[in-house]
Amino acid sequence: MNNTFSPQLNTAVNASLLAGKSVMRFYSRLDSLKITSKGFNDYVSEADQESELIITDALKKSYPKYKITAEESGSNDINSDYEWFIDPLDGTTNFIHGIPQFAISIGLCKNKVPILGVVSVSYTHLTLPTIYSV
């Protein structure tokens, strides 16, 4: 396996863990969570927004020339061979109903081909990093 992308993987793992701590703080106080409907059975909470901000800040700090596409804020205007994809709280509906089946997902593509990904399940403290070998 080619470990060329290990620094990016470490950055994504660390960003997901930081965001996960924030998400779990919100999960511990769901009764006061601010939630907005984006459509039928499609919600965004302040936990989604805070998680996305934490992740995008971490990725921008380490890789300022990479494009970022995130679920809540869309894409930045950077033209790059590398593009991060972020779902800051995959399973928002479960999350807001207190169902502990949600995760943070971060992926990185090079020339539109996936090269690494991280799924972090904060509730169970499980983080699954992957480097794709093509």
Regions found by a protein language model. Give the residues of each.
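Active-site neighborhood of HAD-like aspartate-dependent phosphohydrolases
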Residues: V113
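Short beta-strand scaffold segments in enzyme catalytic cores
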Residues: I104-L108, V118-V119, L126
